[in-house]
Structures are given as structure tokens and as C-alpha cells.
Amino acid sequence: MLVALFAVIVINAQVHDRRVIVGAAGVAPVPGPPPVGDCLLDRPGPDDGWGYGGGPLYPALRLAPCTGARWGEVVSILPGSLTASTSVTTTDSNGTTYTGNPNQSRCSQNVANYLGNAPDSPFGWSMLIGNSAAVGPTTRQRILGQSWIACVITPANGASATFTRYSGSVRNALTVGALPSPFASCAPFVVVADFVAVPCDQPHRIEVFGVAAPASGETRAHLDASCVQLIRWLMRDRDPTKGGLLTVRTAVAHVDPDTGAPTEGFSSNGDPSKAACFIEPASPRQLHGTLFGLGSNPVPWR
């Protein structure tokens, strides 16, 4: 009898507790493109999302607000560029023809802008700070018609042995004079204006601040002077030698037309040359850290 009565009470409670839930089923909203300054949480592939060598073009890597270490930072968004041509041929003022992805050229310029304005160099050194990578929308975003490309700055090419995550930001690095160590270019040595990069937080002899293709008629004296000017500005120190502890140097090389081997010095027949602007200790000691933005701080010796 008690069991039957309990069952009736439970059934009546269930019958009278008919709650009505107001609303309609739906799906979570799909976000739009990430804002400038968001961080890259996935490591890019060896071709940095530009599709070279059979790699994915504009992969959907994770981009999110910055917390902790990251692989890169969003420097700009190119709206509607997902379906744009990836191969355009152009000819420069010297008559040289290039074929490449125009989105990559735009991203490279946006990377430079994100780093801050560089000083006008009388020689035109290209600073080795950062690399451009490309990230595209997710599958859901593409289905809904989103066709943007996120331009991302990374410390180096995805295939580089020096490519690593970092903390802090490179936004306006050239303006404020502060740079996360993975973005600097260090090497154990420089041979005929070429070098093999190593992480700057490891012991090294050389920090390379710029590379260039000297114009015909360029002089070594002018090259050396402009290198000093560049390093003085990037180190934020009127005396980049730190009273003689360091030496500012340039290296120039060209390809020998007879042997095809790289040879020190300017080309004598008008062929292209290449140059490197770097700094090294005046003694046999090694560096352990970047000199970028060093200012009045002591040299980071090993």
C-alpha cells in the first residue's frame, strides 16, 4: 500500500512539473578575422603558409589574444585576399623580372610597418628582423564566406633551426629599441658575407644587423660608415664598440664568374655583390644575448 501510494505521488509530481523552455536551437557564432596584435599559437610549416614546395597555402592555424609564449603576431589582415592570384610577374626598374605571390609582398611591407619606422640609411641595409607568414580562415569561416588572410610576423622561417617561441612583443620594436632575442640574427662566424644563424641566447661570436646588395660603384669606406650608423641606431648607443670591446665590421662578396665560387670583395665586372653588416668582440670572448637596444647596459658576455 505504501509503495503504491509513493508511486502515485512521484507520477503526479512528474505530470505537474511540465516546465516550458523558451528559445530555439542554434550554433555558436563564428568569429571574424583576428585583430592586429593577436598571437600565433601553432608553429607554421617550413614554407610559412605561402604554399611553396607543396605546403598548404594559407593554413588555418590558431590565432588568439596573447598570453604566454607564442610563435608570432598578427601584423595585418588582407580582406578578400584568399582567392586572389598567388603568382604575379613584375619587372623592376633595372629590368629584372620576378614572379611571386603579391600577398606575400604586401605582408612583408606590413611586417616592416609593425616593427616601426626604420632610419633612412645612406646605403639601404635590409635589417634581418622577422619573417612573414600567412594564416587563413578555418573551414567554418570559409564556408560562411570569409576570405581574409592574416599576415603574421615570426622570428624566422619555419624551417630554420633558430625558429622558436618567444615572450613579449615586437610591435614598434624599432621605435622603442626592444626586441625578443629570437628575432635577432646571430652566428658563430661570417664567411665571405654569408653566415649560418644560431640562436642569440646561445654563445656566439657575431650578431648580424643588416644585409645589402651594393650598387655599382659603391665604396668600402661608404659601406663601413653606413654600417656603423645602422648599428649605432639599433643598439641605441653612440659608441657601438663599447669603448673598444666590440668591433663593427662589414663583409662583401661576389660570385667568381670563372669558378662560380663566392669570393671576397666587390665584383669587378658589374655582377651583383652582397654585403653583411655585423658586430663581433674585439677579443676571443663570446657573446650570450642580443645587442639590439643594449644602450648603456653592459655587453652580454658568455
Language model features: what each stretch is:
Residues 1-14:
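Hydrophobic membrane-insertion alpha-helices, especially the h-region
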Residues 15-302:
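Primary mode marks residue(s) on the alpha4-beta5-alpha5 output face of response regulator receiver
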